[in-house]
C-alpha cells in the first residue's frame, strides 16, 4: 500500500492498524530548535481520545504518545528541542477486541472500505477496518501538535456547527463554549439540544453525520502557490483524507454559486496604518490559491458512522447475499472527534506552506515591498 505520506517540506508518514500493537507517525522536515515534549503532544491527543463521553466510542485507549527520535535536550535552555531530523512518534493500542469482528470476517460492511480494499488488494483486515480505521487519525493529531509549533503565531480552532440537519445559531458563536461541552460546539443551546438528539440516535443503534468548521487566524498574506500548489487545494486534500469526510468547502463554498458577483467579491480599502482591509471574507482568506491575510475559513462534512446496530443487506466474499449487524464499539457521531483531527490536518498543511513560502520568498512580506515600485 502506497500513499501513506503527505506534505512536501513538512512531511508526515503514518503507520499502524486499528487492532495492531501500535500506531504512529514520522514527521520529517521539522526545523531544529523547536521546543517539543510529549506533554505538548498529549494535550491535543486527549481532545481526540476515545471513551471520554457516552457520545464517542467506548474503546478505552490512553493514547499515550512516546517520542522515539528527533529531539535532544538543549544545554543552553535545558529544554527538549527538535534536532531537524525525523521525529518518530508511537502510540500503543491497548484495548482491541478483535473477537467482536469474527462474525463479519467474510462480510462487507455497507458504507465501510471493506469492499474497496478487497477489490484493490485482494485482502482486508476485518478487525476494526485495519488501516482504514479512524484509529489512524490519532497519529495525525500527534503530528499536528508539532506542526502548531512550527507556525506558533497561527491560531487554529475547530467547532462542530451542524449535527444531522440541525445547525447552530451563528449569532451565539462563542469559542470558549467549545471547551465546555462534549461536542466542541460554539453554541451552548445547540450543544444542549445535541445531547438529547444524539442520545436518542445512540439508543436506537443508529448514527448521524456532522459539519465541522475550522478557522485559522493570523496566517499572513502570501502562503500558497499557483497553479498546482494552491493553499486551498492542499487544505481540501488534507481534510478530504480524513476518514468519513465526504465534502469540503472554503469560505462561502457551495453557497457562493447562489451569489452575484458584487455580493461575493470581497471589497477592499486601505486601513489607518496603510494596510489592506477586506470588507468581507466570502473567499475564506484565500484568493488564487494564496492566503490574503484574512482568517482561513473551511468546513468539512462527515458522513454518519457506518457501523450501526441496525440490520442491513450486504454480500460476502464468496458472492452470496446476506444480512449484517455491526457489533463492537463505535461513535454514534464520528464528527465529534473529527474536530481535533481537522485542526491537526490544517496545522500540518500550514506548516508545510510556511516552509515552502520561506524557501522561495524568504521571511519578508511581499506586498509592502512592492508598493514603492
Curated annotation (Swiss-Prot):
Enzyme Commission (EC) number: 4.2.3.5
PROSITE patterns (alphabetical): CHORISMATE_SYNTHASE_1, CHORISMATE_SYNTHASE_2, CHORISMATE_SYNTHASE_3
GO molecular function, one term: chorismate synthase activity
GO biological process entries: amino acid biosynthetic process; aromatic amino acid family biosynthetic process; chorismate biosynthetic process
Cited function: This reaction introduces a second double bond into the aromatic ring system.
Self-association and partners: Homotetramer.
Descriptive protein name: Chorismate synthase
Native species: Beijerinckia indica subsp. indica (strain ATCC 9039 / DSM 1715 / NCIMB 8712)
Amino acid at each position: 500500500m502506497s500513499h501513506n505520506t503527505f506534505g512536501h517540506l513538512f512531511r508526515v508518514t503514518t503507520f499502524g492498524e486499528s487492532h495492531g500493537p501500535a500506531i504512529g507517525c514520522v514527521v520529517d522536515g521539522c526545523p531544529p530548535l523547536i521546543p517539543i515534549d510529549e506533554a505538548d503532544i498529549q494535550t491535543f491527543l486527549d481532545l481526540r481520545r476515545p471513551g471520554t463521553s457516552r457520545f464517542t466510542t467506548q474503546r478505552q485507549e490512553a493514547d499515550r504518545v512516546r517520542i522515539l527520535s528527533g529531539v535532544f535536550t538543549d544545554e543552553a535552555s535545558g529544554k527538549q528541542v527538535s534536532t531537524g531530523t525525523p521525529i518518530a512518534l508511537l502510540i500503543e493500542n491497548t484495548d482491541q477486541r478483535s473477537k467482536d469482528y469474527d462474525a463479519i470476517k467474510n462480510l462487507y460492511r455497507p458504507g465501510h472500505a471493506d469492499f474497496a480494499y478487497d477489490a484493490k488488494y485482494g485482502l482486508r483486515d476485518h478487525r476494526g477496518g485495519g488501516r482504514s480505521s479512524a484509529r489512524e487519525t490519532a497519529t495525525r493529531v500527534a503530528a499536528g501538535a508539532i506542526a502548531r509549533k512550527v507556525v506558533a503565531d497561527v491560531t487554529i480552532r475547530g467547532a462542530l456547527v451542524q449535527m444531522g440537519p440541525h445547525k447552530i445559531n451563528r449569532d451565539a458563536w462563542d469559542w470558549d463554549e467549545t471547551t465546555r461541552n462534549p461536542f466542541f460546539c460554539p453554541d451552548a443551546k445547540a450543544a444542549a439540544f445535541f445531547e438529547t438528539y444524539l442520545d436518542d440516535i445512540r439508543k436506537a443503534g443508529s448514527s448521524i453525520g456532522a459539519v465541522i468548521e475550522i478557522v485559522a487566524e493570523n496566517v499572513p498574506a502570501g502562503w500558497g502557490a499557483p497553479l498546482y500548489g494552491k493553499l486551498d487545494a492542499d487544505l481540501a486534500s488534507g481534510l478530504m483524507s480524513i476518514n468519513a469526510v465526504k465534502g469540503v468547502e472554503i469560505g462561502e463554498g457551495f453557497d457562493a454559486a447562489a451569489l452575484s458577483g458584487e455580493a461575493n467579491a470581497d471589497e477592499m480599502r486601505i486601513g489607518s496604518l496603510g494596510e489592506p482591509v477586506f470588507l468581507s471574507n466570502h473567499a475564506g482568506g484565500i484568493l488564487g490559491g494564496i492566503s490574503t491575510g484574512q482568517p482561513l475559513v473551511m468546513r468539512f462534512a462527515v458522513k454518519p458512522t457506518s457501523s450501526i446496530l441496525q440490520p442491513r443487506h450486504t454480500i460476502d466474499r464468496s458472492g452470496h447475499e446476506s444480512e449484517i449487524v455491526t457489533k463492537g464499539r463505535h461513535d454514534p457521531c464520528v464528527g465529534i472527534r473529527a474536530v481535533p483531527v481537522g485542526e491537526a490536518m490544517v496545522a500540518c498543511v500550514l506548516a508545510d506552506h510556511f516552509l515552502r513560502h520561506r524557501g522561495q520568498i524568504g521571511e519578508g512580506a511581499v506586498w509592502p515591498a512592492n508598493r514603492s515600485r
